[in-house]
Amino acid sequence: MREILDGRLRRQLNILEILWNTEWITTAELAEKIDSSEKTIRNDLSQVNEMIEPLSIETSFRAGIILKKDITTPKSFIYSKILEKSLEYTLLETIFLGKVTSKEELSDLLYISETQVSRVINRINQEIRFFDFQITNQIKII
């Protein structure tokens, strides 16, 4: 279901997964692995570092980048932090929990336009059609 994430969050999740599974890695190596520029990687690292407390990303001019984690924090923590930032997952959760009954209510709750709600729903529907359900215009899951 990572395909539902927007491009930025998907890239940030890829960065976190790579950092979780490696020791030190340079920005250039990381950029090559995820097919992005070093500048994009540096910007993402800054944003990611803010969202993953108590974990942290440390940088060294010589060694590169490392994810500092403690043994009590499971890998699922990074996924939960990414999902917290995802408009798509927030929208899905809101619909699944039956908190809204219209696009207008959904747009008010999420502080986005109805047009953006429609775009996100269309993008989600493209991915979930393989699971034989979809979100209708009446904000129902069928």
Please name every model-derived segment.
Residues 1-142:
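Short, basic/aromatic recognition patches that contact phosphate-bearing ligands
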